[in-house]
A protein has these predicted regions:
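Conserved acidic segment of CheY-like receiver
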Residues: 2-13, 18-22, 52
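Conserved phosphotransfer microenvironments
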Residues: 15, 37-40, 50-72, 85-86
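Short hydrophobic/Thr-rich beta-strand motif most characteristic of the beta2 strand and flanking loop
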Residues: 28-36
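Alpha4 helix (beta4-alpha4-beta5 surface) of REC/receiver domains from two-component response regulators
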Residues: 64-65, 84-100
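A short, hydrophobic beta-strand element within the central beta-sheet of small alpha/beta folds
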Residues: 75-85
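C-terminal output helix
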Residues: 106-115
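CheY-like receiver
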Residues: 122-154
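Conserved small/polar residues in nucleotide/adenosyl-binding loops
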Residues: 171-176
């Protein structure tokens, strides 16, 4: 589920519609609003969002560079909404960054399904990231153990097996 979503939109009517659709899709979600690309950059820099929805164009920029920045510098998912005649071109530019591009006019059901897909993809990505962090921690532990073994072998003349056994004894006596 999405907990915090930032809506970047310079059109008040479109902003109200997007907020309404997001509340239908994610009833418990907190929605913040930014009216310009600059406001969006500030909000993204100072807050943690699960997703940033950009209603292209914004008053101070189109929104494609903003979408790239969101995807490359934060953990947030990003959805760009663009006129149907621009959506394919925008998608070609942004999909490799992980931006979901949705064409206007916005269909309620299509928006709902797209946002649910973005949410599921984010959940999956966060699960993979968590697993990756665990593996990095495990790898660092192995490196530390190997450095300890090398020190025992170099300075105390232990064999690799003796160093391993010694470290295992230390570990089990510390755990007890």
């Amino acid at each position: 589920e999405m907990d915090r979503i930032l809506v970047a939109s310079s059109n008040d009517k479109a902003t109200a519609m997007l907020v309404s659709l997001l509340k239908e899709t994610f009833p418990t979600c907190k929605t913040s609003i930014a009216a310009t690309g600059l406001e969006t950059r500030r909000a993204v820099g100072s807050g943690s969002y699960d997703c940033v929805v950009i209603n292209c164009p914004l008053s101070d920029e189109y929104g494609n560079e903003l979408a790239e920045i969101v995807c490359t510098s934060t953990d947030a998912s990003c959805v760009a909404i663009a006129k149907s005649e621009n959506a394919d071109i925008l998608a070609d530019k942004l999909e490799d960054f992980g931006v979901m591009v949705i064409p206007k006019p916005l269909g309620r059901q299509y928006f709902y399904r797209s946002m649910k897909f973005v949410s599921a993809a984010r959940k999956r990505m966060l699960g993979i990231r968590s697993e990756n962090l665990k593996l990095h921690k495990k790898l660092e532990e192995i490196r530390t153990i190997n450095r300890a073994k090398c020190s025992l072998m170099q300075y105390l003349g232990f064999t690799e097996q003796q160093a391993h056994k010694y470290l295992c004894l230390l570990y089990t006596s510390d755990a007890a």
